[in-house]
Amino acid sequence: MIIALTGGIGSGKSYVCKLLAERGISVYDCDAHAKELMRTSQSLQQQLSTLIGDDVFRDGVLQKSILAAYLLRSEDHVQAVNAIIHPAVAHDFEQSGQTWLESAILFDSGFDKRTHIDKVVCVTAPEDIRIHRVMVRDGISRDKTLEWIARQLPQEEVLRRSDYEIINDSIRPLAPQVDHLLSVISE
């Protein structure tokens, strides 16, 4: 069974992945693998340089600020970058043999259609908590955080398309929710 973990920026997906790891479950981090593939794949580097400009890589190192600025300019830019990166990540996941994956933009990117997924788990959190988490974690302004949140599908839509929910509202403990999820999935 292939299980995808998703949720908006700042929802706490990484913490849920940590709890899963503590329970012996390795989760394929789509974002981390996308970054690794951009670092190691000459083909991806060439395609992105052609699309964005040669300055997106300096001595083979991705210039995140240039990529981010390009992505924030338009939805067409996001789709063009996704069309290059996501097929490579989907192929890499399929080759990995892992049964869990984590992707913040599972539905936004169409990644759920690029590879077989049996069940989807959505990590949710109130927007004010998400905003605070991202501002602290990334050291960015509230406006920039809201810009990134607006680039993703609304949390309600992601939840509607998911099979399970883990609520990360700083009130309900996460570990019991993860344990319950694992027991339900294993039935």
Protein language model features and the residues they cover:
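Hydrophobic anchor at the beta1->P-loop junction of P-loop NTPases
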Residues: I3-L5
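P-loop (Walker A) phosphate-binding loop of NTP-binding proteins
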Residues: G8, L20
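ATP-binding Walker
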Residues: S11
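Walker A/P-loop
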Residues: S14
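ATP-dependent small-molecule kinase phosphotransfer cores
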Residues: A32-T99
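Small-molecule kinase domains that catalyze NTP-dependent phosphoryl transfer to phosphate-bearing small molecules
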Residues: V89-F93, K113, V136, I140-V184
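ATP-dependent NMP and nucleoside kinases share a basic, alpha-helical "lid"
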Residues: D92-E94, L101-R133
